[in-house]
From Swiss-Prot:
Principal location: nucleus
Residue ranges annotated as motif Nuclear export signal: 245-260
Highest taxon above the source species: Eukaryota
Domain HhH, chain residue ranges per copy: 48-77
Misc. remarks from the entry: The nucleus of a mouse embryonic stem (ES) cells contains on average 4.7 x 10(5) molecules.
Ranges where the record places region Disordered: 1-22
The protein's role, per its UniProt record: Plays an important role in homologous strand exchange, a key step in DNA repair through homologous recombination (HR). Binds to single-stranded DNA in an ATP-dependent manner to form nucleoprotein filaments which are essential for the homology search and strand exchange. Catalyzes the recognition of homology and strand exchange between homologous DNA partners to form a joint molecule between a processed DNA break and the repair template. Recruited to resolve stalled replication forks during replication stress.
SMART domains tied to this protein: AAA (SM00382)
Organism field: Mus musculus
Name the record gives this protein: DNA repair protein RAD51 homolog 1
Covalent cross-link Glycyl lysine isopeptide (Lys-Gly) (interchain with G-Cter in ubiquitin) as placed by the record, residue numbers: K58, K64
Gene designation: Rad51
Residue positions, PTM N-acetylalanine: A2
PROSITE patterns recorded: RECA_2, RECA_3
Localization per Swiss-Prot or TrEMBL: Nucleus; Cytoplasm; Cytoplasm, Perinuclear region; Mitochondrion matrix
Length: 339
């Protein structure tokens, strides 16, 4: 009940957030853009002014019924509503200090991440099976609904599952641990099963439309790369696979920028079978190559420890030092490892 009130309260403040949050595409009508053209943009998957402002011109021209002259006018008007120029590092630092971090459920893991999973960026977790990737995702889907002072994001969660490993029972166990109503927690998680790489991408267009309607704090894709391994096979299709994957990750980054959600993706590993593997301490590497490496802001490498313990290592981050932390997978989600 309390959670529903919080989410309603956040809806009441949406008027104040108008200048900060994403602006609905209908704002362009007030700037002299034809209502029919706005409708065409919406049908093409552009639901906010930001989405239009960040789009390259050739993407808009590809929309049926949008000429080059119209695309120029739309981009000019969108740029007036969205600040896209230079800013001082002081202002940017101020904005960074307001970023919310979502607790992982483990104090040690939060300490390693300097607060938790960062909103407005992509966090990638990779590791072999049974290393806790999906369990962290399930825990985050609940903790993102907590109030900000309890390490939450005061928003709903969106879960795209490509491997069929989503289990609502796990969410109920985590909800009980935090003293939240199980039915409210499940109501605040939007779930979709991805069946192929094109469908996976299509779901992001739906996600964008839903994020305009309601406040979401977290978007999970578990796993972002599993379907690419089966839909594309062999070296002949490698270039097509990487281009499709790059487009998918670009859309995720755009959602993180536009709506300020925390995007968490899981990735699988591949064993290196070349000569270099003989000299490497750990011959496993994440799949997806450089494209996924550049798209992710923070990369976490998970591996098994003793018993129920798992080890998380910061593999790549623009601001976190390379370090490790231990955590455990318990009946009520991710927690601290017992000594």
């Amino acid at each position: 009940m309390a959670m529903q009130m919080q989410l309603e309260a956040s809806a009441d403040t949406s008027v104040e957030e108008e200048s900060f949050g994403p602006q609905p595409i209908s704002r362009l009508e007030q700037c002299g853009i034809n209502a029919n053209d706005v409708k065409k943009l919406e049908e093409a998957g552009y639901h906010t002014v930001e989405a239009v402002a960040y789009a390259p011109k050739k993407e808009l021209i590809n929309i049926k019924g949008i000429s080059e002259a119209k695309a120029d006018k739309i981009l000019t008007e969108a740029a007036k509503l969205v600040p896209m120029g230079f800013t001082t590092a002081t202002e940017f630092h101020q904005r960074r200090s307001e970023i919310i971090q979502i607790t992982t459920g483990s104090k040690e893991l939060d300490k390693l991440l300097q607060g938790g999973i960062e909103t407005g960026s992509i966090t990638e977790m990779f590791g072999e099976f049974r290393t806790g990737k999906t369990q962290i995702c399930h825990t985050l889907a609940v903790t993102c609904q907590l109030p900000i002072d309890r390490g939450g994001g005061e928003g709903k969660a969106m879960y795209i599952d490509t491997e069929g490993t989503f289990r609502p029972e796990r969410l109920l166990a985590v909800a009980e641990r935090y003293g939240l109503s199980g039915s409210d927690v499940l109501d605040n998680v939007a779930y979709a099963r991805g069946f192929n790489t094109d469908h996976q991408t299509q779901l992001l267009y739906q996600a964008s439309a839903m994020m305009v309607e309601s406040r979401y704090a977290l978007l999970i894709v578990d796993s972002a790369t599993a379907l690419y391994r089966t839909d594309y096979s062999g070296r002949g299709e490698l270039s097509a696979r990487q281009m499709h994957l790059a487009r998918f990750l670009r859309m995720l980054l755009r959602l993180a920028d536009e709506f300020g959600v925390a995007v968490v993706i899981t990735n699988q590993v591949v064993a290196q079978v070349d000569g270099a593997a003989m000299f490497a301490a750990d011959p496993k590497k994440p799949i997806g190559g450089n494209i996924i490496a550049h798209a992710s802001t923070t990369r976490l490498y998970l591996r098994k420890g003793r018993g129920e313990t798992r080890i998380c290592k910061i593999y790549d981050s623009p601001c976190l030092p390379e370090a490790e932390a231990m955590f455990a997978i318990n009946a009520d989600g991710v927690g601290d490892a017992k000594d």
